[in-house]
Amino acid sequence: MDVLIVDDSPVIRQLLRHIIEEGGMRVIGEASNGVEALRCIARRRPDVITMDIHMPVMDGLEASRRIMEEYPTPIVVVTASYSLGDAVTAMQVLEAGAITVTPKPQGPSHPDFERDVESLLRTIRLISEVKVVRRFRRRQGKREEVQPPPPVNHEHEGFQPGVIAIGASTGGPVALKELLQGISRKTPCPVLVVQHISPGFLTSFCEWLNQVSALPVSIGEYGERAERGRVYLAPDGCHMEVDRSCRISLVNGNRDETLCPSVSRLFSSVAKNFGRNAVVVLLSGMGRDGAAEMAELHRLGALTIAQDPATVVVNGMPGEAVKLGAARHVLSPPRIAALLNELPVQSCV
């Protein structure tokens, strides 16, 4: 696998080169800014690009836009900063077509170095398999028309959704943003979200969502009762569950767990405590986290929705749900929001 490193720091480029080559991949070039990156890509055509955000001449955002317009290539944003400003820029880079964001390893002497290295290498290997498409900039002021949603299919008497549970991973932040932008403030029940995201990035991600979401977004706290018309994100390193009174429970994950928080754990608690009176959604993501539990919820009669493969970055989680016959509807994020807006307001817990 051929990797291009784009970072304005020679020290970071050297560190990333060492990590990537020790991981069995080939570094085919280095660039200190976006202009150099575009020249290198035109000549060498890497399989994956690691992209810094802040660089002179051309930053990571503009470079990613240009790359996805001219030479579509899987991009992983590698950043050392989790400030709100950088979170907003990182989300814009994802909207431009980058696949995911991961932390820069902090040097061999740092206690989390080995974990960060393994996370970076795993991310590079995984995104190399993603089929990216050419992205063109949307004209300012031009909004996509959202088709009307399908009717909420009441297959049983007394459908009363008490909770909306959403699972997402790679590609999920942008999909979640699009969904939350379209959802009504009159949403009849709490919205609980498990989004796989790099450790340390969640607080800024939450603040970024609050800038675009129609509903207030916060990080769930142990013992908190989830309220209608609010969105709760699972915290870093904790599985989030919910009981039948919508009280949030947090369970610390083991350090060696690959997925924590887990969509499966959230969906299992929803199945146990709400059964048919739940709405569950799987957005873009690698793997199959939550798919089997969505199938069980579908069997119980819950309203189950998977993101349309035409709109996902990675069709792992929603695609697996569709394969299992677990998705009652397969929709784009704006149409998912439109469908959620059709839920009966009086059915709230």
Swiss-Prot record:
<keyword id="KW-0963">Cytoplasm</keyword>
<comment type="function">
    <text>Involved in chemotaxis. Part of a chemotaxis signal transduction system that modulates chemotaxis in response to various stimuli. Catalyzes the demethylation of specific methylglutamate residues introduced into the chemoreceptors (methyl-accepting chemotaxis proteins or MCP) by CheR. Also mediates the irreversible deamidation of specific glutamine residues to glutamic acid.</text>
</comment>
<feature type="domain" description="Response regulatory">
    <location>
        <begin position="2"/>
        <end position="119"/>
    </location>
</feature>
<feature type="domain" description="CheB-type methylesterase">
    <location>
        <begin position="157"/>
        <end position="340"/>
    </location>
</feature>
<dbReference type="InterPro" id="IPR035909">
    <property type="entry name" value="CheB_C"/>
</dbReference>
<protein>
    <recommendedName>
        <fullName>Protein-glutamate methylesterase/protein-glutamine glutaminase 3</fullName>
        <ecNumber>3.1.1.61</ecNumber>
        <ecNumber>3.5.1.44</ecNumber>
    </recommendedName>
</protein>
<keyword id="KW-0378">Hydrolase</keyword>
<dbReference type="GO" id="GO:0006935">
    <property type="term" value="P:chemotaxis"/>
</dbReference>
<feature type="active site">
    <location>
        <position position="169"/>
    </location>
</feature>
<feature type="active site">
    <location>
        <position position="196"/>
    </location>
</feature>
<dbReference type="InterPro" id="IPR000673">
    <property type="entry name" value="Sig_transdc_resp-reg_Me-estase"/>
</dbReference>
<dbReference type="GO" id="GO:0000156">
    <property type="term" value="F:phosphorelay response regulator activity"/>
</dbReference>
<feature type="active site">
    <location>
        <position position="289"/>
    </location>
</feature>
<dbReference type="InterPro" id="IPR008248">
    <property type="entry name" value="CheB-like"/>
</dbReference>
<dbReference type="InterPro" id="IPR001789">
    <property type="entry name" value="Sig_transdc_resp-reg_receiver"/>
</dbReference>
<dbReference type="GO" id="GO:0050568">
    <property type="term" value="F:protein-glutamine glutaminase activity"/>
</dbReference>
<dbReference type="GO" id="GO:0008984">
    <property type="term" value="F:protein-glutamate methylesterase activity"/>
</dbReference>
<dbReference type="InterPro" id="IPR011006">
    <property type="entry name" value="CheY-like_superfamily"/>
</dbReference>
<keyword id="KW-0597">Phosphoprotein</keyword>
<dbReference type="Pfam" id="PF01339">
    <property type="entry name" value="CheB_methylest"/>
</dbReference>
<comment type="similarity">
    <text>Belongs to the CheB family.</text>
</comment>
<dbReference type="Pfam" id="PF00072">
    <property type="entry name" value="Response_reg"/>
</dbReference>
<dbReference type="GO" id="GO:0005737">
    <property type="term" value="C:cytoplasm"/>
</dbReference>
<keyword id="KW-0145">Chemotaxis</keyword>
<feature type="modified residue" description="4-aspartylphosphate">
    <location>
        <position position="52"/>
    </location>
</feature>
